[in-house]
Amino acid sequence: MLNQFSRTELLIGKEGIEKLQNAKVAIFGVGGVGSFVVEGLVRAGVSNFILVDDDKICLTNLNRQIIATRKTIGKPKVEVAKERILEINPNANVEVYQEFFMPDSKEILDDTVDYIVDSVDTVTAKIELVVRANKLNIPIISSMGTGNKLDPTKFEVTDIYKTSVCPLAKVMRKELRNRGIKKLKVVYSKEEPIRPYENIENSCKTNCICPPGTKRKCSIRNQVPGSISFVPSVAGLIIAGEIIKDIIRED
């Protein structure tokens, strides 16, 4: 009988669909990259989600985040993402945590999680996620930097220790090596970062418009990278694709 996953079933078969529907994916960071990871997963058939993000949707998110519209400005990203998931698949199960994940955060992960997505932008949080994933023996894929870039064709999937060019990947290599982490699947760009234009009138440092109640306002960041619609979205969909392929290939 035809259903919303019929076209996908033609590609991966009934068993593949069943694997995706039974899979549980934890996504940390539901922004420019993470929101498209969610989109790719739910439309493919993944039916169980954990979403973690403390942020609220800001006007400046409209240029790249699929959950950002004029109607969702000021709303928690995890709640908007949950609503979108359920609009696509009403049978999905979605746990949300509106919090900023850090080493002292409570344990959210357990052995029911089949895959972890790191799409956060803080090195400390990224490292902690990898460490926890390794301890729990849960597959994880990590997004490296997608800001200050214009060429989505430069993204590659590889191990962290085979990366180059990306400044974030360089820091991650050092920190993971110091912790004895042997491998990490990542999506990164070989494009040299573009230096952002400086415009005091267009600066989040001096003209912050973060929604009321935002805990980590952009005005406190050392640098706010430039971004565009077609770069982080591609990284997110690549990540979704890697997860889906890994899940359906499992014995």
Stretch-by-stretch model annotation:
Residues 1-251:
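Adenine nucleotide-associated cytosolic modules
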